[in-house]
């Protein structure tokens, strides 16, 4: 999973709360778990279609993001081994940009600003996901093999492994 839940005593009852991802602070919660479960279900579905096991990530861990990636229609997400601390190992970049300016933000900021990218954040280190118009169009594993592509917008992988225009799996 990507988040944690807390139990709160409210008027003599125990309620399950999730973090309030829309707030600036990581400490506030809300008395529901719907947002967390929706993201978790999407992540599990994505991993299942790729036949990949989940790798731990938490909503309050950090991701390095290039400023252009927040608004770009083409986005590349890739994960390296975490250097430790609160870093998840994830990077989010606009592959067409020449800037190398990155900012470190908590993963819940991705949930707020680009929620469509949340599905891929439980992939293990070494994986790369290329997004086109907000949807995954190609996934590469840690051996640089294309394990999924939609055939419409996926770029050619540096090491090959796929046939442009031919999907290996059904669309995600």
Protein language model features and the residues they cover:
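Acidic, proline/glycine-rich low-complexity IDRs
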Residues: 1-172
């Amino acid at each position: 999973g990507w988040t944690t839940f807390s139990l709160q005593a409210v008027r003599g009852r125990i309620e399950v709360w999730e973090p309030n991802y829309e707030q600036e602070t990581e400490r506030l919660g809300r008395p529901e778990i719907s947002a967390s479960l929706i993201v978790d279900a999407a992540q599990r579905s994505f991993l299942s279609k790729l036949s990949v096991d989940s790798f731990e990530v938490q909503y309050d861990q950090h991701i390095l993001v290039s400023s252009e990636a927040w608004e770009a229609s083409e986005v590349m997400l890739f994960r390296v081994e975490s250097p430790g601390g609160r870093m998840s190992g994830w990077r989010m970049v606009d592959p067409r940009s020449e800037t190398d300016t990155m900012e470190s933000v908590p993963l819940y900021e991705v949930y707020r600003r680009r929620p469509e990218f949340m599905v891929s954040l439980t992939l293990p280190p070494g994986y790369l996901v290329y997004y086109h118009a907000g949807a995954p169009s190609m996934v590469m594993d840690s051996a640089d093999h294309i394990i999924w592509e939609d055939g419409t917008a996926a770029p050619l992988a540096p090491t090959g492994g796929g046939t442009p225009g031919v999907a290996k799996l059904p669309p995600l």
